[in-house]
């Protein structure tokens, strides 16, 4: 049996992206289930017009939607985004059944694909649409390079592809998304040296501060985590800036792909609750999370030939106990 084909989670960061989060309207399961299989064809049709634009999309499914769309087992760690409240800072959990992470060299093909996907899905409601852009040399609007710690090569595969721990979903991964809005007035009031202590890296040349100079509540310090054997645990981030000058909106769209949902969740807990508790991420004094959703990113093979819809209780023969419906469900 050939190895499962992952979606393009590890595609290089592009200058343009659209992050589209939708919910499935009541009764829309069949249309959405059918529409998922059409997405690859849409990418080919639109991307064929100009292959140099490197159009791609990664499609991911939320916890509640999974049970509405597919029969059989479900990914072992799939659950709704865990809201966090550390008293001083809060990470909300917001609705989302499907996430479409659309990337290309230019926004025109991203926009065309987003329109086509929503039309193909049919009875869905867009609950969040964010247009991201590359800012100089992959910097965020705070002025720092973003994504420096991303693994590459085999390490990236290991960080983002489920293996024998959940064989039914090998090659897939989990993805967390959050929108952060930045208080640019407060941020720009800091000196460059103060900003560097908040982040844990130098601003101009993107060098990690020495441990002696890096505060325990710096963003970098709280996002470097190890397993029980001392091995650093990695995720792959494809964060992008977004904003609207007229509305005073300046933000970062956080999107983190991981083999284990627990890795990203530990990083977020360190930021919002603190490690130790109370030592929260200093960047949250300037950046506020306004959304939070979690999804599972299946393989391309899964999307091309998904399991059938679950059998609704109203469709079962009279007297059926539906014992088989317990298979693969968390107990």
Where are these regions (language model features)?
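Long, histidine/aromatic-enriched segments associated with O2/redox biology
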Residues: 1-330
């Amino acid at each position: 049996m050939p190895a499962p084909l992952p979606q393009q989670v590890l595609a290089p960061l592009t200058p343009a992206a659209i992050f589209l989060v939708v919910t499935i309207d009541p009764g829309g399961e069949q249309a959405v289930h059918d529409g998922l299989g059409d997405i690859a064809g849409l990418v080919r049709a639109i991307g064929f017009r100009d292959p140099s634009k490197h159009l791609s999309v990664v499609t991911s499914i939320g916890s509640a939607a999974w049970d509405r769309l597919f029969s059989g087992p479900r990914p072992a760690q799939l659950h709704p985004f865990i809201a966090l409240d550390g008293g001083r800072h809060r990470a909300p959990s917001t609705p989302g059944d499907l996430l479409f992470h659309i990337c290309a060299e230019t926004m025109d093909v991203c926009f065309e694909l987003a329109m086509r996907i929503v039309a193909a899905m049919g009875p869905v409601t867009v609950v969040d649409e964010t247009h991201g852009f590359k800012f100089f040399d992959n910097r965020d609007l705070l002025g720092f390079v973003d994504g420096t710690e991303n693994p590459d090569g085999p390490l990236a595969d290991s960080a983002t592809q489920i293996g024998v721990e959940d064989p039914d979903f090998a090659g897939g991964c989990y993805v967390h998304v959050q929108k952060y809005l930045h208080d640019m007035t407060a941020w720009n009031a800091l000196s460059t040296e103060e900003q560097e202590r908040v982040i844990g890296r130098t601003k101009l040349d993107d060098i990690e501060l020495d441990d002696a100079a890096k505060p325990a509540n710096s963003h970098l310090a709280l996002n470097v985590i190890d397993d029980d054997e001392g091995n650093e645990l990695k995720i792959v981030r494809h964060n992008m800036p977004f904003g609207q000058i007229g509305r005073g909106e300046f933000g970062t769209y956080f999107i983190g792909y991981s083999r284990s949902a627990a890795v990203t969740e530990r990083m977020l807990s360190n930021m919002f609750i603190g490690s130790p508790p109370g030592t929260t991420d200093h960047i949250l004094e300037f950046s506020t999370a306004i959304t939070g959703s979690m999804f599972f990113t299946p393989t391309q093979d899964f999307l091309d030939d998904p399991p059938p819809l679950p059998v609704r209780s109203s469709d079962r023969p009279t007297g059926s106990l539906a014992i088989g419906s317990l298979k693969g469900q968390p107990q």
